[in-house]
């Protein structure tokens, strides 16, 4: 049975939660492998909306075990609140399995994240202020605190004190902030130790054993390809590897265990925060997309920047991630447009290119070259097969397939769990 990666092909907020939830009924393990509570997933079940920041979307399926891999950075307060909130709404979820090697977000990581963004001013990255970047920085600098450290109080306190010896110097002398008490930080972390102890496991062994036994393992990426720290629009990126390859390093399974890679793409494009965005619309069309698409961040509540579908952006992600199937979301938002532009190339200082440029300088100068496709006016929210879609809508999907270089296997035609068109089975 397969290992399946679900990952975003644009700049996040593509609707990965919807696709994951759709597949989760047939999944044994649903794994988050990167990022932290800077991500936001929305799943609509009936009349209820569920917002999750840390737990994988598959947690709403009682037959699927949620897993937080070593590539995730954990805010234990957020994890506890999220679990309690879901249970408070009557969702009977087991506690997720947690990698002993996952790193912990502390209050000083969050403080550093916020004051650094303020200090940068107009040069800011546009982070969520959740402490994600500073936590990954400590991980790379070998100063991080891991989940397993919770179970050795002496080690934990030593690590917190050593880290704050340095960070308090920065906070006090550079940012003019008060020093953070290492004892308070350690006490706050240790308060979670006994609650999570039963769920801390060797995630790599659990997942590999499951795959050996024929279980279905779904790896749910946070953020998206173009926010990847290596392949994204650097420096306007996240601090981890949400690309498909990150599923291996962030959970402990080898690349040969991955059988299918499902890329998620909106039928148009959005972005939150700073960074280049060639097809961005700063006019009434952009406001219409934002309004009709409900484009406000789950985590930050910030209005998302909106623009037309950029085939070069998605094609790049399809290539680097070896995407086998594309799930196209929010196609219904485009209903009612007489003509729909699709970016098929860039004009960079008078030169035409049909692929994403190598340098960020060129991307910042890129002007979109559009192809115009006929729109449709029919309501598509009740479509459940590809043939149910209007002819022009079908033509739009087929043209996107040609441009990005992979097949569209699923389409979101509304916010609800059942408002989807499945063209090709995403698991078998």
Swiss-Prot record:
<feature type="binding site">
    <location>
        <begin position="412"/>
        <end position="414"/>
    </location>
    <ligand>
        <name>GTP</name>
    </ligand>
</feature>
<feature type="binding site" description="in other chain">
    <location>
        <begin position="38"/>
        <end position="41"/>
    </location>
    <ligand>
        <name>IMP</name>
    </ligand>
</feature>
<dbReference type="InterPro" id="IPR042109">
    <property type="entry name" value="Adenylosuccinate_synth_dom1"/>
</dbReference>
<dbReference type="GO" id="GO:0004019">
    <property type="term" value="F:adenylosuccinate synthase activity"/>
</dbReference>
<feature type="binding site">
    <location>
        <begin position="12"/>
        <end position="18"/>
    </location>
    <ligand>
        <name>GTP</name>
    </ligand>
</feature>
<feature type="binding site">
    <location>
        <begin position="40"/>
        <end position="42"/>
    </location>
    <ligand>
        <name>GTP</name>
    </ligand>
</feature>
<keyword id="KW-0460">Magnesium</keyword>
<feature type="binding site" description="in other chain">
    <location>
        <position position="238"/>
    </location>
    <ligand>
        <name>IMP</name>
    </ligand>
</feature>
<feature type="binding site">
    <location>
        <position position="304"/>
    </location>
    <ligand>
        <name>GTP</name>
    </ligand>
</feature>
<dbReference type="GO" id="GO:0046040">
    <property type="term" value="P:IMP metabolic process"/>
</dbReference>
<feature type="active site" description="Proton donor">
    <location>
        <position position="41"/>
    </location>
</feature>
<dbReference type="GO" id="GO:0000287">
    <property type="term" value="F:magnesium ion binding"/>
</dbReference>
<comment type="function">
    <text>Plays an important role in the de novo pathway of purine nucleotide biosynthesis. Catalyzes the first committed step in the biosynthesis of AMP from IMP.</text>
</comment>
<keyword id="KW-0658">Purine biosynthesis</keyword>
<dbReference type="InterPro" id="IPR001114">
    <property type="entry name" value="Adenylosuccinate_synthetase"/>
</dbReference>
<feature type="binding site" description="in other chain">
    <location>
        <position position="128"/>
    </location>
    <ligand>
        <name>IMP</name>
    </ligand>
</feature>
<dbReference type="InterPro" id="IPR042111">
    <property type="entry name" value="Adenylosuccinate_synth_dom3"/>
</dbReference>
<feature type="binding site">
    <location>
        <position position="13"/>
    </location>
    <ligand>
        <name>Mg(2+)</name>
    </ligand>
</feature>
<keyword id="KW-0342">GTP-binding</keyword>
<feature type="binding site">
    <location>
        <position position="142"/>
    </location>
    <ligand>
        <name>IMP</name>
    </ligand>
</feature>
<keyword id="KW-0547">Nucleotide-binding</keyword>
<dbReference type="GO" id="GO:0044208">
    <property type="term" value="P:'de novo' AMP biosynthetic process"/>
</dbReference>
<dbReference type="InterPro" id="IPR042110">
    <property type="entry name" value="Adenylosuccinate_synth_dom2"/>
</dbReference>
<feature type="binding site">
    <location>
        <position position="40"/>
    </location>
    <ligand>
        <name>Mg(2+)</name>
    </ligand>
</feature>
<feature type="binding site">
    <location>
        <begin position="330"/>
        <end position="332"/>
    </location>
    <ligand>
        <name>GTP</name>
    </ligand>
</feature>
<comment type="pathway">
    <text>Purine metabolism; AMP biosynthesis via de novo pathway; AMP from IMP: step 1/2.</text>
</comment>
<feature type="binding site">
    <location>
        <begin position="298"/>
        <end position="304"/>
    </location>
    <ligand>
        <name>substrate</name>
    </ligand>
</feature>
<feature type="binding site" description="in other chain">
    <location>
        <position position="302"/>
    </location>
    <ligand>
        <name>IMP</name>
    </ligand>
</feature>
<protein>
    <recommendedName>
        <fullName>Adenylosuccinate synthetase</fullName>
        <ecNumber>6.3.4.4</ecNumber>
    </recommendedName>
</protein>
<dbReference type="Pfam" id="PF00709">
    <property type="entry name" value="Adenylsucc_synt"/>
</dbReference>
<comment type="subunit">
    <text>Homodimer.</text>
</comment>
<feature type="active site" description="Proton acceptor">
    <location>
        <position position="13"/>
    </location>
</feature>
<feature type="binding site" description="in other chain">
    <location>
        <position position="223"/>
    </location>
    <ligand>
        <name>IMP</name>
    </ligand>
</feature>
<dbReference type="InterPro" id="IPR027417">
    <property type="entry name" value="P-loop_NTPase"/>
</dbReference>
<feature type="binding site" description="in other chain">
    <location>
        <begin position="13"/>
        <end position="16"/>
    </location>
    <ligand>
        <name>IMP</name>
    </ligand>
</feature>
<comment type="similarity">
    <text>Belongs to the adenylosuccinate synthetase family.</text>
</comment>
<keyword id="KW-0436">Ligase</keyword>
<dbReference type="GO" id="GO:0005737">
    <property type="term" value="C:cytoplasm"/>
</dbReference>
<dbReference type="InterPro" id="IPR033128">
    <property type="entry name" value="Adenylosuccin_syn_Lys_AS"/>
</dbReference>
<keyword id="KW-0963">Cytoplasm</keyword>
<keyword id="KW-0479">Metal-binding</keyword>
<dbReference type="GO" id="GO:0005525">
    <property type="term" value="F:GTP binding"/>
</dbReference>
């Amino acid at each position: 049975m397969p290992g399946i990666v679900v990952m975003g092909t644009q700049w996040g907020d593509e609707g990965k939660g919807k696709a994951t939830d759709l597949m989760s009924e047939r999944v044994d393990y649903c794994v988050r492998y990167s990022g932290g509570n800077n991500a936001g997933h929305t799943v609509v079940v009936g009349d209820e909306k569920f917002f999750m920041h840390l737990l994988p979307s598959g947690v709403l399926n009682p037959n699927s075990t949620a897993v937080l891999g070593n590539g995730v950075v954990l805010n234990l307060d957020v994890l506890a609140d999220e679990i309690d909130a879901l249970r408070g709404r009557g969702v009977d979820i087991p506690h997720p399995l947690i990698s002993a090697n996952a790193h912990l977000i502390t209050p000083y990581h969050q403080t550093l994240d916020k004051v650094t963004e303020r200090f940068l001013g107009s040069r800011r990255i546009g982070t969520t202020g959740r402490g994600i970047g500073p936590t990954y920085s400590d991980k790379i600098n070998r100063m991080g605190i891991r989940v397993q450290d919770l179970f050795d109080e002496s080690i934990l306190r030593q690590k917190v004190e050593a880290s704050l010896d340095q960070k308090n110097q920065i906070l006090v002398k550079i940012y003019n902030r008060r020093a953070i008490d290492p004892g308070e930080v350690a006490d706050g972390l240790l308060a979670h130790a006994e609650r999570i102890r039963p769920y801390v496991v060797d995630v790599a062994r659990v997942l590999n054993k499951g795959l050996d036994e024929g279980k279905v393992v779904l790896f749910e990426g946070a953020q998206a390809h173009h926010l990847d720290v290596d392949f994204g629009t650097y420096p306007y990126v996240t601090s981890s590897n949400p690309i498909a390859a990150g599923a291996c390093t962030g959970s402990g399974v080898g690349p040969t265990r991955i059988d299918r890679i499902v890329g998620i793409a909106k039928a148009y494009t959005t972005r939150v925060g700073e960074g280049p965005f060639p097809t961005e619309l700063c006019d009434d069309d952009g406001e219409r997309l934002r309004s009709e698409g409900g484009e406000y961040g789950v985590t930050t509540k910030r209005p998302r920047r909106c623009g037309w579908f950029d085939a070069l952006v998605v094609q790049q992600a399809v290539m680097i991630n070896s995407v086998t199937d594309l799930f196209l979301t929010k196609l219904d938002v485009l209903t009612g447009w007489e003509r729909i532009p699709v970016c098929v190339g860039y004009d960079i200082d008078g030169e035409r290119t049909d692929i994403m440029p190598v340098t960020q300088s060129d991307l910042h100068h890129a002007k979109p070259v559009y192809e115009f496709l006929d729109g449709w006016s029919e309501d598509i929210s009740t479509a459940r097969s590809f043939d149910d879609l209007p002819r022009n809508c079908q033509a739009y999907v087929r043209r996107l397939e040609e441009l990005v270089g992979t097949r569209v296997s699923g389409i979101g035609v509304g916010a609800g769990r059942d408002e989807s068109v499945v063209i090709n089975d995403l698991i078998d």
